[in-house]
């Protein structure tokens, strides 16, 4: 029988529940060991129980008391930035690695197609944000061709897809995404904006990426972006370019550098969710959980092969 790594998910909200269903359906080398929440009436805990997953509504302490905790080899945290600091401290004492889906960013930022391999052995990795997972690959693709002086992303998500955790973390979202645009995407300066779109019926997740780089070949930049999109599609099938990449050779004022001539690149993206738990318009959740699943599968495969 093939050995699998048992995982626990802390957080029975939208992200945690969607991730659980992905693990149950497409886990590969990982399997569910526990679903953890703090609301006994949450739909996520109810679904987990119906699907035969051990559950607790007593948070981290409840997880530690579960008979099967000793077999848990990896924990996903889909709660909040503040809660993750507490969870990480306790689980680090017990030697249990974590994948952090909050903006806490205790560990390194990880975007699977950009730097997943480099951090495969880390004990705590951070999945940035939904906007970061969607847009940082594009910034990195431009960075592979030319020096990126500035990158700005605008993530527009359906208001209905934003649960209480997302709403509570708006400030952390912008700060974490901005830092990761620089640290992972390779931009010298990054900025992130999130928009909760109240439109009805809800619209798909849309992301706009602007970069200003050193002069470069438009065809090389476009080819790099298209190759990166294909890599992301390997684990997020609903990820696509909304239209062809747009370019403008222009001159802008950069802080400390004066007027600089370069290439402005504009990329419009759409992320359609897989509808494992929430509707297709919740691509913002799908890309986070899909990226986290990809990282967990890579870590599990490495551990099992060791």
From Swiss-Prot:
InterPro entries linked to this entry: Acetaldehyde_dehydrogenase (IPR003361), Acetylaldehyde_DH_C (IPR015426), NAD(P)-bd_dom_sf (IPR036291), Semialdehyde_DH_NAD-bd (IPR000534)
Catalytic activity of the protein: acetaldehyde + NAD(+) + CoA = acetyl-CoA + NADH + H(+)
Signal peptide: none
Enzyme class, UniProt record, top EC level: oxidoreductase
EC number, UniProt record: 1.2.1.10
Active site: 130 (acyl-thioester intermediate)
SUPFAM superfamilies: Glyceraldehyde-3-phosphate dehydrogenase-like, C-terminal domain (SSF55347), NAD(P)-binding Rossmann-fold domains (SSF51735)
Protein name: Acetaldehyde dehydrogenase
Higher taxonomy: Bacteria, Pseudomonadati, Pseudomonadota, Betaproteobacteria, Burkholderiales
């Amino acid at each position: 029988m093939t050995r699998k790594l048992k995982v626990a998910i802390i957080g029975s909200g939208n992200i945690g529940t969607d991730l659980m269903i992905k693990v149950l359906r497409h886990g590969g080398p990982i399997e569910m060991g526990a679903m953890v929440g703090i609301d006994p009436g949450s739909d996520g805990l109810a679904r987990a129980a119906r699907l035969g997953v051990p559950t607790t509504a007593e948070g981290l302490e409840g997880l530690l008391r579960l008979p099967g905790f000793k077999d848990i080899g990896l924990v996903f945290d889909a709660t909040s930035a503040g809660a993750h600091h507490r969870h990480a401290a306790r689980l680090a004492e017990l030697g249990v690695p974590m994948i952090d889906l909050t903006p806490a960013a205790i560990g390194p930022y990880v975007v699977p197609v950009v730097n997943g391999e480099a951090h495969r052995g880390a004990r705590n990795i951070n999945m940035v944000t939904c906007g970061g997972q969607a847009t940082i690959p594009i910034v990195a693709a431009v960075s592979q061709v030319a020096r990126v002086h500035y990158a700005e992303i605008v993530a527009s998500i359906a208001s209905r897809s934003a649960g209480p955790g997302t709403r509570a973390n708006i400030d952390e979202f912008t700060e974490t995404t901005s830092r990761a645009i620089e640290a992972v995407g390779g931009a010298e300066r990054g900025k992130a904006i999130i928009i909760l779109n109240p439109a009805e019926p809800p619209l798909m997740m849309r992301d706009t990426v602007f970069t200003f780089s050193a002069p470069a070949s438009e065809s090389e930049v476009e080819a790099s972006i298209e190759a990166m999109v294909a890599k992301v599609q390997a684990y997020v099938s609903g990820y696509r370019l909304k239209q062809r990449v747009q370019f403008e050779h222009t001159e802008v004022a950069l802080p400390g550098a004066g007027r600089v001539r370069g290439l402005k690149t504009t990329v419009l993206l759409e992320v359609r969710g897989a509808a494992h738990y929430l509707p297709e318009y919740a691509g913002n959740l799908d890309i986070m959980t899909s990226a986290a699943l990809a990282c967990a599968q890579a870590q599990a495969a490495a551990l099992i092969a060791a």
